[in-house]
Amino acid sequence: MNIYLIINHENQRIQNLIDKYHLKHDENSSMALIMNSNSLELYDRSKPRNKSIKVNFSSKKNNYRCLNFKKKNEILYKAIGIKKNYFPSVLDATAGLGQDSFLISFLGCYVIMMEYHPVIAALLTDGLERGYKDEKIGFWLKKRLHLIYDNSLNILNIPISQPDVIYLDPMYPINKKKSLPKKNMQFLRKLANKDDQSKNLLKVARKFAKKRVVVKRPSYANPISDEKVDFIISNKYHRFDIYLPFKKK
């Protein structure tokens, strides 16, 4: 994968990530990776006024969301199927920058993130490595949140345990009536493959999940497939379309 590389500081851990994901410098790439003293950040060179982004599981935003979590108001809790003494294993097949995966793991679930894009995988790995060492979250994060670098469409051929739940959060369709998506989403849209594999991924997920497949959608969007949604959990801003696994013949 070619991308513009900016080396602000020499850091062997960060360099190892660059090598691991075979990231090569491209002078003409509009997207850049910044190698800082202890983090890897993504930057859009075509929009120099925008700040760079990184995966930071110990950020103030994550801390706030966790500390102010209320079960009755958090539809993600219900969508995943978490109960008092039941914490399903979860495969996040569209990890992105790992925000929902982090919250699901905070709630007590064992979560595996899958990401096929080398730049995003490098950002996630950097975030995990720093998170594992964090004094506040490291002790539980290293037990519950992990990453597999592969295409989620291959899950039937990967030697991993069947998860109770497969979580899908495909790219939201652009709503022309609203302002541009948040910066993180704009960055991901620029990096990601434009081919929408959501329908195929849903079919594969329904073959592999034990209990349910959870698809996150904005309130204004249609389901990702013509397949029947078994039930829906929603609030004002977004909803979760829940699909049960295919019955084995």
Swiss-Prot record:
Q: Which reaction does it catalyse?
A: guanosine(1516) in 16S rRNA + S-adenosyl-L-methionine = N(2)-methylguanosine(1516) in 16S rRNA + S-adenosyl-L-homocysteine + H(+)
Q: One Pfam match, by short name?
A: SAM_MT
Q: Give the top-level enzyme category.
A: transferase
Membrane-spanning residues: none
| Positions contributing to S-adenosyl-L-methionine binding | D169
What InterPro entries is this protein classified in?
A: 16SrRNA_methylTrfase_J, SAM-dependent_MTases_sf
The molecular function terms in GO held by this entry are: rRNA (guanine-N2-)-methyltransferase activity
Keyword list (alphabetical) reads: Cytoplasm, Methyltransferase, rRNA processing, S-adenosyl-L-methionine, Transferase
In terms of Gene3D superfamilies, this protein maps to: Vaccinia Virus protein VP39 (3.40.50.150), YhiQ-like domain (3.40.1630.10)
- Cellular compartments per GO CC: cytoplasm
Query: Which cell locations does it reside in?
Result: Cytoplasm
In short, the EC number is 2.1.1.242
Recorded family membership:
Belongs to the methyltransferase superfamily. RsmJ family.
- Protein's job: Specifically methylates the guanosine in position 1516 of 16S rRNA.
Q: What is this protein called?
A: Ribosomal RNA small subunit methyltransferase J
Taxonomy of origin reads: Bacteria, Pseudomonadati, Pseudomonadota, Gammaproteobacteria, Enterobacterales
